[in-house]
Amino acid sequence: TKRFRLIPTPHLPHGWDSAMLFEESDRTLFVSDLFTDSGDPAPVIDSGLADRAHQFLLRAEQSLFAHSTNFNPSSRGQLEALAELGPKTLAVMHGSSFSGEGSQELLQLASAMEDVFKKQAVIDG
């Protein structure tokens, strides 16, 4: 039996209606547009997911996708709460999914997003 939990994540990564889905028995977190990557990535990886997403965000903010991802004062807390679920799989919508310690990748993503969007705030001024 599968048990799914809907987790509202307003404005993470986009609009007020954003949400993640967590399957409790397999510990799979469906992460929507978090961890987006481009190109032709492998279907599943076991390391480096947050690093790939960080690089994508840096490129995206210099392209027509600038400002498409939101990071606000509640975003880090939302990512920390998702990490507390202890996901073993991160099911990614646009890029490689991840098998392993998903909590670490979520926390690394929070730091990566802070890095990208603090730089953007300085640029936008």
Residue ranges and their predicted role:
Residues T1-R5, S25-T28:
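Beta-strand-turn-beta hairpins that frame and shape the catalytic cleft
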Residues S99-G100, Q104-G125:
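C-terminal regulatory/interaction regions
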Residues K2, K88, K118-K119:
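Context-gated lysine
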